């Protein structure tokens, strides 16, 4: 089944300390967002990419898309005040009922195989997310004082893409807007609906989100490793 993907790209990423949109930072000579777009552009099931941007950066994005031509249709949509509002605006650009993915622009290492598994699950259940089991011990801390050690066996770190039937996610966003609910991800909006259910597909630990300067070092290492594997 074909799908559209909504990619929020309006955030400034303050933890990256780059003084600009972190998606414009270059990895191996190309901006982060270009690496991410290439994944979906080369995936045969992707019908359309909806890039949700800060309106003040529209010309910059237009120039990037001119410098790096893509075969897949890419639509630029002005975002909102919060990520959730931006995604909702992006969803409104999807023209027909289908599976829709929501993906962080700063996750350039998602693989086609993972997307395929995610779509297959969403087709069956309506909502599916990528996640990986937590490897580290997790503690709840207040004022630098440990208050609780949390049992990690049932804890998973959630990633993107997240996949949904369009009608389900639109309903979830509409309900959240009506209730004034601001979720941490799109799956949380479905979860807060009556009867809302989200399935998990195991992802990969290399599907990192570039959030801090240290993540750029990790990203370069991942790219070096993947480049080396291609020549084995």
Curated annotation (Swiss-Prot):
CDD domains: CDP-ME_synthetase. This is 2-C-methyl-D-erythritol 4-phosphate cytidylyltransferase. Its EC number is 2.7.7.60. It comes from Bacillus subtilis (strain 168). It is an enzyme of class 2 (transferase). One of its GO terms (molecular function) is 2-C-methyl-D-erythritol 4-phosphate cytidylyltransferase activity. It catalyses: 2-C-methyl-D-erythritol 4-phosphate + CTP + H(+) = 4-CDP-2-C-methyl-D-erythritol + diphosphate. Keywords: Isoprene biosynthesis, Nucleotidyltransferase, Transferase. The record marks 15, 22 as: Transition state stabilizer. Catalyzes the formation of 4-diphosphocytidyl-2-C-methyl-D-erythritol from CTP and 2-C-methyl-D-erythritol 4-phosphate (MEP). GO terms for biological process: isopentenyl diphosphate biosynthetic process, methylerythritol 4-phosphate pathway.
